[in-house]
C-alpha cells in the first residue's frame, strides 16, 4: 500500500452539479422550510442538497442518513420530490454477457477507476462517489462510535490518536491481517460516511496529524476502519465507524492582567461561538474538576471578562473555553489559560471574638485570617491608642501606640473550619497577670515591615464576692458584702432554698451599682424576700467591648421571718386599778398552730426579755367570753391567722402594777431569729397611772 502512515491528499472531485434540473426545485423547497421556521439555515444547507443529488440516492432511509439530525424528519418529503422530478426511462436491452475474465489485483496504495469509451451519462441510479479506492459506503442502520479520538492541538497541527482496533467476537475467526484507519473530517456537521468527508489520513497506525488551519467554530473528526485478509479485501469491505471527536476552535489573542485587585481578561472568540466559559481555579486545585470554579455564568464573555471577586494574596489559574452547541450538547474548546497572582493587601482583623472561661481566669480568641500576611495578638492592660485602628503603619511604630514586644501573645495558634465552611484562627487558654482585672486584646496584621491594627476587644476578670451578710430589720433586710474587684455592678438572684446556681437562674433579680452600694451602705430589700425564706445568689457584673460579662456566683441562705403582732385591752375597776387583760394575736400569713408565749409583768419598767419580770396567769376565752380552761403561765393559739379575730386570751392582773409585755417562749436562738413579735403602742401595756 505504500506509505500508509502518511497523509494522503483529498481525492474528492468538485464536479459542478448546477446543470442538474432537480437542484432548483429542491432549493425552492428548502427555502420554504427555512421561511416557515421548520429548519434553520445553518442546519440545512445547499451543500446537503448537492450531496444527495451527487450520490444518486433516492431511498428514504438512505437520504435520511445523509441529512443532519435536525433535518432528517424531512427525508420522506425530499424522496417524494426527487421521485416526481425523475423522468421514467425505457429499460434498455440487456448487453451481451462478456466472457468472465480474472480481475487484476490493484497495485498497493493506488486507486484505479474503470475505463470507458464514452463519458458517463447522469442517470437516476446510484452514482459512485470517489472513495480513494474503497467500496462505496452502503447506508444501513445508524452507526455509533465505540471510542473517542484524543485530540491535542499544537502550534503547527492537530494530533489525533485513538485505541488500536480490536476485532469483535463475531469476527474473531475471520482473517483481519490488514487494519486500515480512514481519518476524515468535516466542518460544522458530522459526516454521514467517510466518502464525502475530507480525508485527513489513511494509516495503519492509531494516530494521525491534521495540519490544516481550522476556520469554522466546529470540526468533526471520524476514524473509520476497514479490515480484511489483504489490503484489497479490506478496501472492498464496508467501513465501521470506530472513533469520533469534536474539536471546537479556541479563543485567540488571550490576555490576562490584574488591575487594583480585579482581574481583566481579553480575547477574540471565533465566529459562530455562542459563549466563552470562564474558570477561576485556585492554583493548588488545578487538577480538580474545574466545573465548580466557573464564574461569570450570566454573560457570553465573547470579548473577555472583568472579575471583581478574587481574593487578594491568592494565586489563580484563569481558563477560557469556547462553547458551541453541537446536536443539543454543549462542546468546549481546549483551554486558553494563564496564572495570575494577586498582590496581597494589608487588611485588618475586624471580627475578633473573645470568649471568657467560666472561672474568669482565661479566655479563648478566634478570628478570620486575612488573605495576606500573618496576625499577631497583643495583650495589654489599657489597650492601644484609640486612633490607631485600621491605620497602616511601620512595625517599628507599634510601640508608639502602646503595643510593646513583651505584650505579644506567644502561644501557638490553630486553624479550624467553621460550620459555614470558612477558616477560623484560634488561641485557647489565654491568661493575663493576676493583678489585672481587665485585659485588652489587639489583633495586628503584619506583612513585611508594615502593620495594621484591627479591632481591639477586652476581657474582664472580676473578683469573687466574699463576706456576705444579710441583716434583718423586721420590716426590711440589708445585704452587705465586700465589693468585688473589676465589677461595675452586682446582681442578686432569688431562688428556692438550697438551689444550685449552676442549674440556672431565672427568678426575680435585683442589681446595684458601686455608687448606690456606697451611698446606702448595702442593698436594701424592703418586702422583697419571701416570708418562708429563700436563697440569694450574688454575681459581679462587668462590661467588656460593649458585652455584659457576669462573673462567678456566691450564695447565702435566708431562713425567712414570721411577723406577729399582738394587741392588749386592759380592764380596770372603778378606782382605775387593772383587773384583767384581753390579748389578741395576728400573723403576716396563716400558720397552723403556734409557738408558746409568756405575758411578763415588771412593776418598774417595760420588760426587756422573757426573764425580765414575772409571768402572768392566763387562760383562753370561749365564744361567750368565759374562761375556757384553767389558768396557766403560757399562751398557745391553735392557729395564727392574718385577721387575728379568732381566739382571745385573758390575763389576771389583780394586784399588779407597772408594765406587761408578751414574749415568744422558745429556748432555741435559731428559732427565735425567724419570728418577729411586734408590740402594740406602749401606752396599752401600762398597768398603773404612774408616769414613767
Swiss-Prot record:
Compartments where located: Cytoplasm
Disruption phenotype: Loss of DNA conjugation when disrupted in recipient strain (MKD8), no effect when disrupted in donor strain (mc(2)155). The recipient strain does not secrete EsxB. Disruption of the probable saeA-saeB-saeC operon completely blocks polar localization of EccCb1.
Gene Ontology annotations for the cellular component aspect, listed alphabetically: cytoplasm
Comp. bias regions, Basic and acidic residues: 1-21
Domain of life from the UniProt record: Bacteria
Keywords: Cytoplasm
Residue span of region Disordered: 1-23, 87-134
Biased composition (Pro residues): 89-107
Other notes: DNA conjugation in M.smegmatis is unidirectional with distinct donor and recipient strains; mc(2)155 is a donor strain while MKD8 is a recipient strain. Mutations in a donor strain that alter DNA transfer do not always alter DNA transfer in a recipient strain.
Role this protein plays: May be involved in assembly of the ESX-1 / type VII specialized secretion system (T7SS), which exports several proteins including EsxA and EsxB. Involved in DNA conjugation in recipient (MKD8) but not donor (mc(2)155) strain.
Protein name (database record): Putative ESX-1 scaffolding and assembly protein SaeA
Originating species: Mycolicibacterium smegmatis (strain ATCC 700084 / mc(2)155)
Gene that produces this protein: saeA
Amino acid at each position: 500500500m505504500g506509505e500508509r502512515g502518511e497523509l494522503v491528499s483529498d481525492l474528492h472531485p468538485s464536479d459542478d452539479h448546477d446543470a442538474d434540473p432537480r437542484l432548483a426545485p429542491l432549493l425552492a423547497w428548502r427555502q420554504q422550510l427555512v421561511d416557515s421556521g421548520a429548519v434553520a439555515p445553518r442546519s440545512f444547507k445547499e451543500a446537503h442538497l448537492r450531496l444527495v443529488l451527487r450520490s444518486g440516492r433516492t431511498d428514504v432511509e438512505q437520504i435520511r442518513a445523509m441529512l443532519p439530525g435536525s433535518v432528517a424528519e424531512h427525508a420522506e418529503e425530499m424522496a417524494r420530490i426527487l421521485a416526481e422530478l425523475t423522468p421514467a426511462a425505457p429499460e434498455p436491452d440487456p448487453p451481451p454477457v462478456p466472457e468472465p475474465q480474472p480481475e487484476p489485483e490493484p497495485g498497493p496504495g493506488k486507486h484505479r477507476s474503470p475505463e470507458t469509451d464514452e463519458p458517463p451519462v447522469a442517470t437516476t441510479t446510484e452514482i459512485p462517489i470517489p472513495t480513494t479506492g474503497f467500496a462505496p459506503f452502503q447506508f444501513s442502520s445508524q452507526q455509533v462510535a465505540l471510542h473517542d479520538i484524543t485530540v491535542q492541538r499544537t502550534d503547527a497541527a492537530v494530533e489525533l490518536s485513538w485505541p488500536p482496533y480490536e476485532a469483535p467476537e463475531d469476527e474473531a475467526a475471520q482473517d483481519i491481517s490488514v487494519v486500515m484507519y480512514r481519518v476524515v473530517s468535516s466542518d460544522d456537521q458530522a459526516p454521514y460516511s467517510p466518502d464525502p468527508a475530507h480525508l485527513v489520513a489513511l494509516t495503519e497506525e492509531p494516530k494521525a496529524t491534521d495540519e490544516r488551519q481550522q476556520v469554522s467554530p466546529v470540526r468533526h473528526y471520524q476514524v473509520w476502519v476497514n479490515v480484511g485478509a489483504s489490503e484489497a479485501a479490506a478496501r472492498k469491505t464496508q467501513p465501521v465507524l470506530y472513533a469520533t471527536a469534536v474539536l471546537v476552535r479556541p479563543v485567540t489573542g488571550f490576555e490576562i492582567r490584574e488591575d487594583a485587585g480585579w482581574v481583566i481578561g481579553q480575547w477574540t472568540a471565533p465566529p459562530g461561538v455562542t459563549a466563552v466559559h470562564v474558570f477561576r481555579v485556585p492554583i493548588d486545585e488545578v487538577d480538580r474538576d474545574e466545573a465548580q470554579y466557573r464564574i461569570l455564568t450570566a454573560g457570553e464573555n465573547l470579548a473577555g471578562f472583568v472579575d471583581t471577586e478574587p481574593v487578594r494574596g491568592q494565586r489563580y489559574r484563569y481558563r477560557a473555553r469556547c462553547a458551541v452547541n453541537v446536536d443539543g450538547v454543549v462542546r468546549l474548546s481546549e483551554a486558553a489559560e494563564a496564572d495570575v497572582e494577586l498582590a496581597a493587601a494589608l487588611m485588618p482583623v475586624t471580627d475578633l471574638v473573645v470568649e471568657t472561661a467560666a472561672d474568669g481566669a482565661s479566655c479563648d480568641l478566634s478570628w478570620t485570617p486575612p488573605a495576606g500576611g500573618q496576625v499577631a495578638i497583643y495583650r495589654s492592660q489599657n489597650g492601644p491608642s484609640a486612633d490607631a485602628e485600621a491605620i497602616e503603619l511601620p512595625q517599628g511604630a507599634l510601640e508608639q501606640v502602646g503595643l510593646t514586644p513583651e505584650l505579644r501573645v506567644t502561644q501557638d495558634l490553630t486553624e479550624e473550619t467553621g460550620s459555614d465552611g470558612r477558616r477560623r484562627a484560634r488561641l485557647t487558654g489565654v491568661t493575663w497577670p493576676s493583678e489585672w482585672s481587665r485585659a485588652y486584646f489587639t489583633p495586628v496584621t503584619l506583612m513585611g515591615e508594615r502593620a495594621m491594627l484591627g479591632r481591639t476587644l477586652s476581657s474582664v476578670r472580676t473578683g469573687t464576692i466574699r463576706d456576705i451578710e444579710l441583716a434583718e430589720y423586721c420590716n426590711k433586710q440589708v445585704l452587705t458584702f465586700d465589693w468585688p474587684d473589676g465589677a461595675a455592678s452586682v446582681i442578686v438572684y432569688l431562688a428556692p432554698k438550697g438551689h444550685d446556681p449552676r442549674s440556672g437562674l431565672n427568678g426575680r433579680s435585683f442589681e446595684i451599682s458601686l455608687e448606690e452600694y456606697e451611698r446606702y451602705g448595702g442593698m436594701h430589700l424592703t418586702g422583697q424576700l419571701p416570708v418562708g425564706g429563700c436563697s440569694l445568689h450574688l454575681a459581679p457584673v462587668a462590661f467588656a467591648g460593649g458585652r455584659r460579662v457576669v462573673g462567678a456566683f456566691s450564695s447565702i441562705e435566708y431562713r425567712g421571718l414570721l411577723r406577729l403582732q399582738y394587741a392588749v385591752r386592759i380592764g380596770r375597776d372603778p378606782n382605775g386599778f387593772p383587773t384583767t387583760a384581753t390579748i389578741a394575736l395576728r400573723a403576716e400569713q396563716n400558720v397552723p398552730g403556734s409557738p408558746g408565749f409568756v405575758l411578763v409583768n415588771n412593776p418598774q419598767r417595760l420588760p426587756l426579755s422573757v426573764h425580765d419580770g414575772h409571768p402572768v396567769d392566763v387562760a383562753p376565752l370561749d365564744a361567750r367570753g368565759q374562761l375556757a380552761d384553767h389558768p396557766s403561765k403560757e399562751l398557745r393559739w391553735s392557729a395564727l391567722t392574718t385577721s387575728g379575730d379568732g381566739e382571745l386570751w385573758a390575763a389576771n392582773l389583780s394586784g399588779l402594777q407597772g408594765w406587761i409585755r408578751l414574749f415568744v417562749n422558745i429556748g432555741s436562738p435559731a428559732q427565735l431569729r425567724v419570728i418577729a413579735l411586734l408590740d402594740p403602742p406602749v401606752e396599752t401595756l401600762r398597768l398603773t397611772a404612774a408616769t414613767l
